[in-house]
Every structure is written in structure tokens, then in C-alpha cells.
Amino acid sequence: MGDQPRPPVPPAPGSNPLPMGSTPPVLPGRTPNPNANVANQVGDPFRVLTPEELAAPISAASNKVATREQILGIVADLNALGFVGDPALGLFDLAFHCYDIGSSPSAQPVGPSPFGCSRMQVAAVVRNHCTLRQLCMFYAPSVWNKAVRDNRPPGNWSNLQFTPETKFAAFDFFDGVLNPASQEVPLWRQPTPQEIYASATHKDVATYRAASKAHDRISNSTLLTKGASRSTPPALLPGPDA
């Protein structure tokens, strides 16, 4: 067989294979910026920002809260399906319903929606863009305001072992009330430290109970668990006769 052409040898690390003044190749899938000047755009990443730069506003963001873009996408899909209504009222209605039933992936909303369909249909569209809890987190301040103003605690606050003093914190997106990425509305009243502690405690208990379902214990009492949580059985060394 004849000699086959050999592929070009890659340049050694640290070398400069391009002639001075030439344009480096564009990587696949990248779009060159015609306005870029590599020599002048390097900048100093270690410089101290000016007072004006520090004063520039930056919107709060949280991966636990639905973004405005996601919410606009939800409304667009609802309208495309023929579910037309006041979007603020319709989505708030779903969030306040979840105030009672929870916003977990297993939540099954019931009843009609202001969009002219069922709440379950609205929830299905929501879940194409974000989790139900992320949407509820966004509307949590408004949910809190209505609940406190109407003296209307979540329906299952007693079953969740909340006290009368902390009952208004007995919903699973309570964190959204004070999250800066949530809807910006003045609060009817601030959550009390007791309500904040009760919500955090309940979350820890719920997390432990979920993990303990894989245990072989018949009780979650700390007398048995010593506060430890294990989702898989411990690895044991073989016995002397093994």
C-alpha cells in the first residue's frame, strides 16, 4: 500500500502556532464575536469595583422559586390550551390551594380553577415549566398575607404537630414568605421567630421520616436511633467462620 497522509501534529503545550495578527479558529458550535478584540478585552478580574458598579441593582434569584420567565411560559401554555383568565388570580388560587394540601410532587389538586378548567389541569401545565412548589414559593408572600388577614391557618396544622402559636407556618413552602426572589409585596405581618423555628423543625422531622422508611426499625424514637439516620443497612465484616 502507498503512503497515507498523516494528520498534522498538534502544537506543543504553551506554543503559539498562529502567526502574529492572525485570527484563531472558531470552535465547533461557537459563534465568533465580530466586535471582540482579544488584546483589549482581557481586563483585570482582580480589580476593585467602583461605587457606581456596586450600586447597580441585581435582581434576587433562587433555584427554589419559579422565575418570571417560567411563569410567563405557564400562562402562555394555559392560553394556548384555551384556559383564559386573570393569570395572577388563577395562579394564586392554585398556590393557596396548595397551602392546604401541600406542594410536593405527589400533591393532587382538586376543584375548579379561575382559568375555567380544573386545578389539576393548571398544575399539569405548571409542572412542564417548574415544580409546583417553586410556583407556590413565588406566591408565598401573598398566600401568607391572605391567611394571616383572614385568620385562616392551613387545614392540617394540628395533624402536623404545630402549636396554636405557630399554626400559620404549617405549609411546605413557608420559606417563600421571606425569600427575596418571591413576589415583592408588603407583608401583613412578619413571621415570628417561633414560626420560623417551627417550620424548620418540621422540615427536618419530615426529612428524617422519609429517610427512615428504608430502615428496619419499628420506631423512630431517639432512644433507639440516637439521632442517627441511615438509608442503607450498615456493611458488616464476615464472621470468623466465613
Swiss-Prot record:
Checking InterPro entries in the record gives: Pltvir_coat
Q: Name the GO cellular-component terms.
A: helical viral capsid; ribonucleoprotein complex
Q: Where is this region: Disordered?
A: 1-41, 219-242
What does this protein's UniProt record list under function? Required for genome encapsidation. Forms ribonucleoprotein complexes along with TGB1 helicase and viral RNA.
- Name the principal localization, coarsely classed: virion
What terms describe the molecular function in GO for this protein?
structural molecule activity
Q: Where is the composition biased (Pro residues)?
A: 1-16
Disulfide bonds, which pairs? Answer: none
Q: Which domain of life is it from?
A: Viruses
UniProt-annotated location(s): Virion
- Keyword Ribonucleoprotein in the entry? The reply is yes
Q: What is this protein called?
A: Coat protein
Q: Family per UniProt? A: Belongs to the potexvirus capsid protein family.
Which UniProt keywords are present, listed alphabetically?
Capsid protein, Helical capsid protein, Ribonucleoprotein, Virion
Q: Polar residues: which segments have biased composition?
A: 219-232
